[in-house]
């Protein structure tokens, strides 16, 4: 919860709570840090719902030498879109990335859908693990809605932009509905979502990002553009414990220290759930872009169940497997991750965040 008038929380002059760690109090005015660009860099729009693991993924993209982060778009999911947008702007101010931040969808494509409860037991009441976030920031969101920013940037850089989507797929679906031509203009889509040969994490059938807007996810999977899906089949194998977070903070300075600080309750949740540390869901999707050799993939057409008890279930039809006529027929084959070198993924995060 942010400090401010009426909520009984005392603040420093910069708007942060008393007792906030130095990594927060030192944010101050927005920084701007720029990487030296080259022609081999991958242009990325990061569609996100920050979100604790989203923060780590965003820092990874910001720090990676071969990533040109050209846009950040927000959506509902780990918290309301108001909170996730504020969180993305806070991280922009703290870390100094230049990419515009655009506010996106507040709910799923289907307006009659039952509003979902935010996962406060995982990501805290503010989406960033209850880590104190200033109520007032010195950076502002782009005037365009997220789907329009996606359309504009993809059209401005045909064949060059990869969409890395780690929340509900609503912004991507809205962009496709408004501008179907972008499907032929993107370099690719990498998403964190789905449970293809394992159980889900919000229901036995469904992973949360897909369940939260199943119609949007089905559109994303069945559109004729290249999708790489990084689901629970692999992300749940990549766990970072407190020692790993401490190492990141030691290697990565103040930027990584902020990730360490806001991840503490998130680690607790996963330890209580039987894991060895926090599951690094979203950063896996980023690393599938920069280091695809660390993953094993199958090719499959994918459909998403959009109603009933299995709503949000991602159902692959593997390449070459024969069935009778079905709703999978005629749809493009996508890449679905089924294996991962977890140790190498964690090592790559450390190497990328190292100052």
Regions found by a protein language model. Name each.
Residues 40-90, 130-236, 242:
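Active-site histidine-anchored catalytic micro-motif
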Residues 41, 60-61, 68-69, 211, ...:
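Conformational coupling and interaction surfaces
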Residues 101, 220, 286:
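A residue-level signal for conserved active-site and pocket-lining positions in enzyme catalytic cores
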